[in-house]
UniProtKB/Swiss-Prot annotation:
Tissue specificity statement from the Swiss-Prot or TrEMBL entry: Expressed in blood leukocyte, lung, placenta, small intestine, liver, kidney, spleen, thymus, colon, skeletal muscle and heart.
Protein name, entry field: Low-density lipoprotein receptor-related protein 10
Naturally occurring in which organism (per UniProt): Homo sapiens
Gene: LRP10
Family from the record: Belongs to the LDLR family.
Residue spans, topological domain Extracellular: 17-440
Region Disordered, annotated ranges: 564-637
Example GO biological process: lipid transport
Key word Cytoplasm present: no
Amino acid sequence: MLLATLLLLLLGGALAHPDRIIFPNHACEDPPAVLLEVQGTLQRPLVRDSRTSPANCTWLILGSKEQTVTIRFQKLHLACGSERLTLRSPLQPLISLCEAPPSPLQLPGGNVTITYSYAGARAPMGQGFLLSYSQDWLMCLQEEFQCLNHRCVSAVQRCDGVDACGDGSDEAGCSSDPFPGLTPRPVPSLPCNVTLEDFYGVFSSPGYTHLASVSHPQSCHWLLDPHDGRRLAVRFTALDLGFGDAVHVYDGPGPPESSRLLRSLTHFSNGKAVTVETLSGQAVVSYHTVAWSNGRGFNATYHVRGYCLPWDRPCGLGSGLGAGEGLGERCYSEAQRCDGSWDCADGTDEEDCPGCPPGHFPCGAAGTSGATACYLPADRCNYQTFCADGADERRCRHCQPGNFRCRDEKCVYETWVCDGQPDCADGSDEWDCSYVLPRKVITAAVIGSLVCGLLLVIALGCTCKLYAIRTQEYSIFAPLSRMEAEIVQQQAPPSYGQLIAQGAIPPVEDFPTENPNDNSVLGNLRSLLQILRQDMTPGGGPGARRRQRGRLMRRLVRRLRRWGLLPRTNTPARASEARSQVTPSAAPLEALDGGTGPAREGGAVGGQDGEQAPPLPIKAPLPSASTSPAPTTVPEAPGPLPSLPLEPSLLSGVVQALRGRLLPSLGPPGPTRSPPGPHTAVLALEDEDDVLLVPLAEPGVWVAEAEDEPLLT
């Protein structure tokens, strides 16, 4: 998603660049586009693809001959070498523009043709143009005569015998003798169509010194050729052109051609001082007037660059040739001295003015409010206004370091050039820019690239981790290396019992040593029972001294007794009571225990034999609920019983207890039972031993034994 957004931003910046244009077919192809509206706007078509192909777009504004088309330029910035905008009307000569005129253009005659041309071949392009037009009826001045066709002619053309209106309305109703005061005076012969070869000179149009009206159009040409290869500077010190009059300046000798045109002046330039600089050492000045023109013409001077007129003062050394110096103004007149405007590039004409200390420049001419304010050279043309009227930021031939000079002779910050936002008043800081993305797009692209790089690193890390895990799974079936084999195939450390048996550590009292040849559970139980037999008191009397067991062993024995795996220890009284309850059927128990008569003789009743465990009591069958209670009878004392071991083997008791706990369902199946007999009594005893594990000892004995040592759980 982020990459798609960046691509859209880049594409939007490319489409918004002014060097990409496309010309609409209705204006840039034959026939030209016809505009029938009374008013409207026109602008240079926007560029889309490239600047390789030339273009020629034409618009035709239709109107009647009685109407005047007024054209106002909101913007006009064209590259004079490769772009041109021309305007033509029936009553107006061709006007060629690449910069905006100072005032609106009024083109009489109705139909006006506007043509925009571009050379192509990737030639430089300006910012384009934007103009508005309107068709109005021409309102004549007080000293003019309005014809029936709404044209305005001079009042002196009224009844002069010449049809100036075109419809004869200016001659209608006139007597045969014209008014003597309106008869034109003869014009004296003045120098015209001459060549001026001096290094400097002065020339003027015919009739400039005195106002004279000519009844026919007039054209004059001056060739300026001082025979020097340096450039010429032609300065028009006074302009008073009539409506329809024009002055054209061409570079080089020869007949006037539009390709060599340097500047065109009309009545819109009246009252201004205009300087034209040639590209070569020669120039041609052409002057054209219309019939009965009320303009006086012009007055001009010329000189070779590097020289000044005798009545002018030279500028300082800092005003030599170079970029940004203007139109060859290396000289200034006395009227330009201390007027608050820099006519020299280094400000020589504004140095040492009254009211300012040395090294300072005044903000205005003498006698004005700005004459008392002075500024240093470092405060000039730095895009920071010092003077109240901004005189320190006007007519900048050079800008302070870090600033850019606009074509309107003002300065802006250099970092603002070609940033996509016009900062100069004429927008020249965005002209002739190579394709540069705005800072916002560049910032977004950098941040996006960093994020993408981070995501790529994370993806690579995850891939490597997954690959390592997959490789580790496959390595299970691979042969182990020597180091891995040593780690995996290590022998387990010996147990505590093995260490005691091997003599590595001293034996602990009552801790069963492990026999390497006997690893069965039965062997371990026999070892445990052996310890229990050794724990019995040899005499069996109450005063016999018990052998002290280890703490671990005592804890183990207590747990086995609690679980019912070992019988409780009985007192002598309980042992004698058990002997009195033994039946003759207990004789086969001696055979089950595996003991012999002589071997049993060594034991004593009541626990005298240390190796004999106390006998297990016989469980009496519970009375059935369905049977009626029988009268209580005292059983007769049985006869003498054969000798019976009172204390069955501890091993058999433990084994039977394990059998009863683990295999409780084992028993002799059969639906019927035979009457009890001597043999069945023995089997019943064994079965009862299987069912009844170990009777619980009396609470007093258990408590007394528990108080012997607390149980740690």
